[in-house]
């Protein structure tokens, strides 16, 4: 049965997880998909989605056009809204990963839904961050920085080397033509990024370039100062959800008094009534 809703749903925003197929898709998302009139696939695995629904439109060719990313996102958003306006509610969009992690199309649909008088419902899914912390063996609960590679330099974002860092879309550094096909990366493409990162980390600090696929994950270790030496690897996997994981430096305790207090029952009695 479809997920409960007080009113009809015009658009469901769904994710099928990181690995190929739908093994990481939640039961709630599958129910919503099966209850839909039409499914737009932006996940890159329309074949798997067609096993769950008979009416699937693959938007692969509409996505990989070589245009600027914002132009692609706008057109896809307009396509989905036009379908609902012209033919009625009951549309689902399926993407890879979590539907609301690093997905401008879905966020625009959700943020503009009230103005358009559309009921847009996003359902949780499994993102690359969920799987990557298992792949690299680091708990996000210890604190993390998650940044888009171009925004890192564009906005001059300062990084804390004592927090683990995930740099998304690293293979697309230096361009917004993210779906424009290229033959190779020229020498020096990643030199400005290496220079930026080594403002916060030593040049010999080792990072991991990773495509998170569980047991089939693809990785390459590289020193930050030598990042440009991995340009062939970065090109080969630029469209595969490639991320750079930078491990954290250990951080010493800065407030010994607070550290002592949080383990002290007498201190707890001074800030709360015990049961």
Where are these regions (language model features)?
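Beta-strand/loop-alpha-helix module characteristic of Rossmann-like adenine-cofactor folds
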Residues: 2-14, 32, 38, 119-121, ...
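Class I S-adenosyl-L-methionine
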Residues: 1-123, 242-243, 267-275
């Amino acid at each position: 049965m479809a997920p409960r809703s007080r009113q009809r749903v015009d658009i469901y925003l769904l994710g099928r997880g990181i690995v190929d197929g739908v093994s990481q898709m939640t039961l709630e998302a599958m129910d919503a998909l099966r209850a839909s009139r039409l499914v737009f696939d932006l996940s890159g695995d329309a074949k798997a989605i067609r096993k769950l629904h008979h009416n699937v439109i693959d938007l692969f060719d509409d996505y990989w056009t070589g245009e600027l990313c914002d132009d692609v996102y706008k057109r896809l958003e307009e396509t989905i809204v036009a379908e609902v306006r012209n033919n009625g509610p009951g549309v689902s969009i399926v993407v890879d990963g979590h539907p609301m992690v690093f997905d401008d199309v879905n966020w625009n649909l959700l943020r503009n839904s009230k103005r358009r008088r559309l009921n847009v419902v996003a359902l949780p899914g499994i993102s690359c961050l969920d799987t990557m912390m298992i792949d690299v063996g680091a708990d996000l609960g210890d604190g993390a920085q998650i940044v888009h590679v171009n925004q890192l330099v564009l906005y001059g974002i300062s990084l804390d080397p004592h927090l683990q860092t995930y740099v998304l879309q690293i293979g697309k550094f230096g361009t917004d033509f993210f779906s424009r096909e290229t033959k190779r990366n020229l020498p020096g493409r990643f030199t400005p990024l290496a220079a930026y990162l080594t403002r916060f980390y030593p040049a010999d600090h080792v990072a991991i370039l990773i495509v998170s696929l569980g047991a089939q994950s693809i990785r390459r270790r590289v020193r930050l100062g030598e990042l440009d030496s991995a340009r062939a690897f970065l090109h080969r996997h630029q469209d595969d959800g490639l991320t750079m994981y930078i491990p954290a430096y250990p951080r010493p305790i800065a407030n010994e008094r607070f550290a002592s207090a949080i383990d002290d029952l007498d201190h707890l009695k001074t800030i709360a009534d015990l049961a």
